[in-house]
Structure formats: C-alpha cells, structure tokens
UniProtKB/Swiss-Prot annotation:
The gene is LEUC. Its main location: cytoplasm. This is 3-isopropylmalate dehydrogenase. Substrate binds at residues 96, 106, 135, 224. It is an enzyme of class 1 (oxidoreductase). One of its GO terms (biological process) is L-leucine biosynthetic process. It comes from Zymoseptoria tritici (Speckled leaf blotch fungus).
Amino acid sequence: MPTYNIVVFGGDHCGPEVTAEALKVLDVIDNSNADVHFNIQPHLLGGASIDAHGEPLTDEALAAAKAADAVILGAIGGPKWGTGKVRPEQGILRLRKEMGTYGNLRPCFFASESLVKTSPLKEEVCRGVNFNIVRELTGGIYFGERTEDDGSGYAVDTEPYSRAEIERVARLAGFLALAEDPPCPVWSLDKANVMATSRLWRKTVTDVFANEFPQLKIGHHLIDSAAMLMVKNPRALNGVIVTSNLFGDIISDEASVIPGSLGLLPSASLTASPDGKSKCNGIYEPIHGSAPDISGKGIVNPVAMILSLGMMCKYSLQQPELAKKIDEAVRNVIEKGINTADIGGSAKTAEVGDAIAKELEALLK
C-alpha cells in the first residue's frame, strides 16, 4: 500500500474552508479499499504565516513542501496584509521558485453538463468546451530585469526566455496531449508578429513537436486572436493550449469565466512531466482567491478544491482511476442539485463537501 506525503497549506480567509472539505475526500480514500494511504502535513502559508511567524513562508514549511509527494493549497492573501514589504504573495512565489513548478495547468470544462446554463456565454457557444491551458510559470517577464519608476516617469520590464525553458514546457504540453484518448491537438499562443521572444517561442515549439511529437497536431495563434476566439468559438481551442507566463496569466483568467463560477475550476503547478518515470511534485489549488468578503460564512464553493485533488491523483500520485472517481463523485453531486449559491444552489460549503465525500465512498466500494 503506497503512502503519500501531502503538505496542506490552508492559507487565508476561505482557503482553510475549502481545504477542510478536501481533507474529507482524502479521508474517504484513506479508509476505502483503494489501497492508498495519505500522510497529511499541515503548514502555514501567506498571511497566516505572516501572523504566526513574521514571514509568508518559513524554511521548515518550504522544506516539507519540497520533500512531499504533492502540495494542496487553499488560497492566500487579503486586504489585512496590504501591499507592504512583507506580503502573502511572496510566499507562493518563493514556493513555486524553490519547488521548480515550471508548468501551470488550468483546465476549462464543465464538471457537469447541467452547468452549461450557468455560463455567461450562450449554451450553443460553450457546450462541449474542454481545453487545458499550460502556462510557463517560472520564466518570462515576471522574472526578467526591471527598472522601477524613480520619479522620472519611466519604468522597464524585460521578458527573457531561453530555448531550454520553452522546450521544457512544450514537452509537458505534448505529453499531456499524447496522454489523452484519443490524443488531442496542441495550440501554441504567442505574439510572434511583434516580439522577439515570441518568435523564439514559435520556432522552438515547432521544432519540439516536429522532432518529438510528430503524431500530434500543433497549431499557432497570436495571443490577441486567441483571446477573441475564446469568446467567439472556444471549442476551436479544445485540446492543450501552451503559452508564456504573461499570456498564460491573462488568457487563463479569461477562460475561467466560461463555466460560470471561479469555484468550479482546479489547477496544478507541476515540477516535471507526469510520465511515471520520475517524481512529479505539484501544487494543487482552486483558481479562485481567498475571497475575504465571503470567508467565514460557509458559502464558498469547494468543488474547485476537490477537483484539484483529482488532478493530484492523476499527475503526482499516478492514480488515474482515483482521479476519475473523484470527478465522477463531483459530477453526481452537482447533478443532484447539492450546490452552493454561486451556481444556483442553497447548500453550504460543508454540505457540498459531505455530499461529495459520501458519493465517493459509495463509488469506491
């Protein structure tokens, strides 16, 4: 029976509320016939860590995360900690950098067909949307040299990218596309008509797929036309989307509104391709923030957090059947109408979590 070491960062505000529901799901698996055991290690991150330790991420918590099989994160940040010298966001940036989570995965899909009506897009436009955005997470403009405005009214950000960085994330996208049944197309987004780094990006991605994934379809879109296409005909992007840090940050937020609630979509940030040959640690978290306006009210949607567990089982733990069971349990509960207010229901956070745990327990018998 494999035992997996899982570090849990509840984080701030509604973060601990959703991780509490995730732990219910892990407890069900732990006590089922799945022959899987979890060693849960809770630690502080973000504002909670600042309050307790004066820093957003302690060396002890970082070491635990790096040594773990996977990391679960609720959400961090909030107005209490402002924009001062020590900020919650510094903790997650350090965590990503030190763990080396170079690939951020944000799938866009409907957890249940019944949710199509919650989308801001027309049903005939969004029905059948199913793509996975792979964002390069540790390079690009967020990590380039910068010059702050010193009062002169002038500032500079630079976007560096190396061929090796682009090759690595392109291979991750190719692996994910190849793992689908049947293999799906890959869409690379750039701004090659203007930016030198984008021209390097396009050439490198083209070379990787020609040499290493010749059986896959690879297409290229300029980021601005892709942003338009995502609203006009998002199914045209079904498959795997791969793009740079900045473009991925923006386009994944655009995609996040398609299912109708931020509380529905999971994410993963991976340290390696999940090929089963080497360790693939990852940070698994919902795409929503800490939502201080609703924290403590018991109304935050735990679905995104629980679906993130499914991604954890699929990628870091190499337990694809468990991942399918988690997704199925979530779908069944949504279709039974046990939903939080953001998707038209009246259930509380804990009620949804309890229902999913109970459904999963039945599926694992």
